[in-house]
From Swiss-Prot:
It comes from Streptococcus thermophilus (strain ATCC BAA-491 / LMD-9). This is Acetate kinase. Pathway: Metabolic intermediate biosynthesis; acetyl-CoA biosynthesis; acetyl-CoA from acetate: step 1/2. The gene is ackA. Keywords: ATP-binding, Cytoplasm, Kinase, Magnesium, Metal-binding, Nucleotide-binding, Transferase. It holds the Pfam family Acetate_kinase. HAMAP family: Acetate_kinase. Belongs to the acetokinase family. Catalyzes the formation of acetyl phosphate from acetate and ATP. Can also catalyze the reverse reaction. Mg(2+). Can also accept Mn(2+). Mg(2+) binds at residues 8, 383. It is found in: Cytoplasm. Substrate binds at residue 89. It comes from the Bacteria.
Length: 397
């Protein structure tokens, strides 16, 4: 038995889960927030206990040191030597990484180089990797890429209709994201369908603060909503999703300060989506509460969100010439019966029949009637488990 840590590091946070492998037993999990800010919070959950502490954490190295010390302090491990592998979620792997990879200095340099494709994610992941390499230099270090699952997309799906030089010189193309989640839930959906995944057509909807939809044909991603960066596709909590590119010069003509690329990136990534339309919140629970209270901006934000989700799901029926199932996963997908019902209400033409009671009260599994031509599943995602499995697989190579 060995112990593996799955890491999801952001610019100011570090989410982790410790597994006993290959048994896939979760020994502990935790979250460190506000890294680099005052009053950082570290939370550890294990054996039906939850322990939190507030302290100042300067950087990711200090965050990892606190994580490791907590594992000892709470007697979850006796020694650092028990940890033999660490897997890191990395959003953007570009065309360099077609699958999960052992991390050496070359791989780490490439991950940092690809930060332009995931400016909100890759820098944090790189910081997490460097922190573990400094503190536990001898363990197996693996990068698991959100984009890897989508490398099976055909060129017709991933190319943009811009001059060829932008692709050949700068690799401007669709890469997608949330691939680890889409891979996991599509495999689980195939089990629920009782069919080999190679014989299935599944539309997976990862609906959280970030949102992406993927067409999975025969277990392979054939199209996905996020694009060159995680900004593309469906409207999200604070991100625009797809836009007419002419909006950018149009706004710059009227607000010259928007000519700064960093300013545009910030507005479209941090001030848009549900937050931008509602002018209240990026949290769907707040949006629904506002809608129910008669707030017109919250109602519009909700309706726009549902509309964009429905359109992408519908278009992937066309991409695959049908679908056996739709899967909802991630925070909103798993927990908001309202959003699921609203989205599916506009897809009845495909033969979808939702069981209202199952949708409201059934947290996991099939939420359709026995007569539904297309099944709809609610499946909790488990990206950390996929990461731990890839570490175990690459350790034995």
């Amino acid at each position: 038995m060995t112990k593996t840590i799955a890491i999801n590091a952001g610019s100011s946070s570090l989410k982790w889960q410790l597994y006993e492998m290959p048994e896939e037993v979760v020994l502990a999990k935790g979250l460190i927030e506000r890294i680099g800010l005052r009053d950082s919070v570290s939370t550890v959950k294990f054996a039906d206990r939850s322990e939190s502490q507030t302290l100042d954490i300067a950087d990711h190295v200090q965050a990892v040191k606190i994580l490791l010390d907590d594992l000892i302090r709470f007697d979850i491990i006796k020694s650092y030597d028990e940890i033999t592998g660490v897997g890191h979620r990395v959003v953007a792997g570009g065309e360099y990484f077609k699958e999960s990879s052992l991390v050496d200095e070359y791989a780490l340099a490439k991950i940092e180089e690809l930060s332009a494709s995931a400016p909100l994610h890759n820098p944090g992941a790189a910081s997490g990797i460097r922190a573990f390499k400094e503190l536990l230099p001898d363990i197996t270090s693996v990068a698991v890429f959100d984009t890897a699952f989508h490398t099976s997309m055909p060129e017709v799906a991933y190319r943009y209709p811009v001059p060829n030089r932008y692709y050949t010189d700068y690799q401007v193309r669709k890469y997608g994201a949330h691939g680890t989640s889409h891979q996991y839930v599509s495999q689980e959906a195939a089990k629920l369908l009782g069919k080999p995944i190679e014989e299935t057509k599944i539309i997976t909807a990862h609906v959280g603060n970030g949102v992406s939809i993927t067409a999975v044909d025969g277990g392979k991603s054939v199209d996905t909503s996020m694009g060159l960066t995680p900004l593309g596709g469906v409207m999200m909590g604070t991100r625009t999703g797809d836009l007419d590119p002419a909006i950018i010069p149009f706004i710059i003509d009227r607000e010259p300060d928007m000519a700064d690329a960093e300013r545009i990136r910030h507005v479209f990534n941090k001030e848009s989506g549900l937050l931008g339309i509602s002018e209240k919140s990026s949290d769907m629970r707040d949006i629904i509460a506002g809608k129910e209270a008669g707030d017109e901006k919250c109602t519009l934000a909700y309706d726009l969100y549902v509309d964009r989700l429905r359109k992408y799901i519908a278009q992937y029926f066309g991409v695959m010439n049908g679908a056996d199932a739709i899967v909802f996963t991630a925070g909103i997908g798993e927990n908001s019966a309202d959003v699921r019902a609203s989205v599916l209400d506009g897809l009845t033409w495909f033969g979808i029949e939702v069981d209202p009671e199952k949708n409201v009260f059934g947290r996991v599994g099939d939420i359709t009637t026995a007569d539904s031509a297309v099944k709809v599943f609610v499946i909790p995602t488990d990206e950390e488990l996929v990461i731990a499995r890839d570490v175990e697989r690459l350790k034995t190579k």
